[in-house]
Amino acid sequence: MVRAVIPVTRRLQHAGRYPVTRAPNVAEGWTLTRLTAPSRLFGANGLRTGPDGRVYIAQVTGSQISALDLSTGRLDTVCPKGGAIIAPDDLAFDQDGNLYATEVMDGRVSVRAPDGHTRVLRDDIPSANGITFHQGRLFVGECRDGGRLLELDLNGGAPRVLARNLPSPNAMEVGPDGLLYFPVMGANEIWRIDPDGGVPQCVAGDLGVPDAVKFDPHGHLVSTQVHSGEVLRINPRTGDRTVLAALHPGLDNLTFVGERLFVSSFTGEITEILGTGETRTTLPGGLTWPLGLAVDADGDLYIADGTYFYVLLADGTLRVGGMLFSAGYPGFLRGVAALGSGEFAVTTSNGEVARYRPWASESEVVATGLDQLYGVAVAGSGALFVAERGAGQVLSVRPDGVEVMASGLSDPVGVAVTADGRCVVTEAGAGRVRTLGDTGTLLDGLQCPQGVAICDRQVYVIDSGAKQLVAVDLGSRTPHTIAWDLPVGAPAGVTPKPLRGMPPFSGPQGPFAAITAGPDSTLYISADADGSVLALRRES
């Protein structure tokens, strides 16, 4: 069974990705503890060493770019959530210090001047991802099946196509020989092309799914492998490779600061590769969101975190049950509910409901073609109640088909099941909580209700807008606030831009401050603002 490891004291005011002005508070008779540490970043994607020597870090899901000072450890936000740049995936600098960012979900390339002014250079590059600047020339790749490799006109003219029909090219670099090197994820190879024209050539193949390449100061090609978790040094003339480090799946990009090599990971971890297989953690990883939560029959807490699925161990560490590139992974996970015997019902951002057995590396899709799925709950009959936010519906998914239980809802997000089998749903767009089949509303006047759980005839709702946990009795329907100033939702004054998704890896993404209850009535909360998981208990 999971247990809390960090009491809620001043330590909740952690200098992470979320600006904390007030520590969380709870009503009398309750205690709040933190189970996982806050995350410093919203994951870590593209890396680039800036002209000031800092390491710039793109964070797709956070719509944020941060800069890390290696000498002090200081982490500054350069482009914040809710700002002009949306879902940045890779970065490059020109000779004047302008920062170019690919916005993978919006198909854009934007330019941020040293004074902070930002403008869109192009908005017609689907799955814009890899980017590099070389001798006044800007190159961009589309990370999709049938993607193109482009040279962009810095004045906004039509791009020049270097290559077409590429199977998902990614983060690229011009080598000492003047050729443009780029990983091709769909081919599991690294290619190169003359930027002045020519046919792509394969440099190395049979890799661990390369997703980024850079050159070290000695002219060696270095590449991260997203599937195998290896960092390889490759001879660009022969294709021979050496393993510099074996880390974990989910590596994303790399950068050199002088002779020092740093790599990024989906988890937000930044690792320095020291040579001879040794590594050093520069920034620790953490949860990217988190999203849905579920407690199994053994009392273990499972966490859906988009590209990862975790179980929280008793010592507070996270054990990976599966991730985007592991066998049987259903896809970008959002909602989760325990089914028993190591099996879970999950919803994905690709519009699928699946039964997932992480320890067997198996999954089975039971419904597909749905629009922005969020919470899932299991009825006593075995049916799965699912919130379909995009269609404004709650669905019942059974082996014999899918039935619409309610329609015309305003952004349904969270679902839970009462002891007598009724479905409770939160409507984030209407600020209310409804029990399906009832004539009235269970709770209204909320700002943005998301996660919902039922325990001991109490309905617990996370209001991510008000940053509160509200409880309402199913009988009296009297509400009361249990916790406030919770690290959920967006910071005050920030309106996040929509994350449209990046097929085939994910559909539209969005926050989900979930809540679930354990067998001992402990409440677990997805603190999606600071990237932690909290536990709320009644005092004995």
Regions found by a protein language model. Give the residues of each.
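Short loop/turn segments immediately following the C-termini of beta-strands
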Residues: 60, 104, 143-144, 185, ...
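Beta-rich, blade/repeat-based domains predominating
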Residues: 6, 38-52, 82-99, 108, ...
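A short helix->beta-strand "capping" segment at the edge of beta-propeller domains
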Residues: 18-40, 496-502
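Beta-propeller fold detector
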Residues: 34, 76-80, 119-123, 160-164, ...
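Blade-level signature of beta-propeller repeat domains, shared across WD40, Kelch, NHL, RCC1
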Residues: 506-540
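Beta-strand-rich domains and repeat architectures in extracellular enzymes and scaffolds
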Residues: 34-64, 527-532
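Short loop/turn segments that connect beta-strands within beta-propeller blades
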Residues: 69-73, 112-117, 152-157, 193-198, ...
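Sequence/structural signature of beta-propeller modules
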Residues: 1-29, 539-540
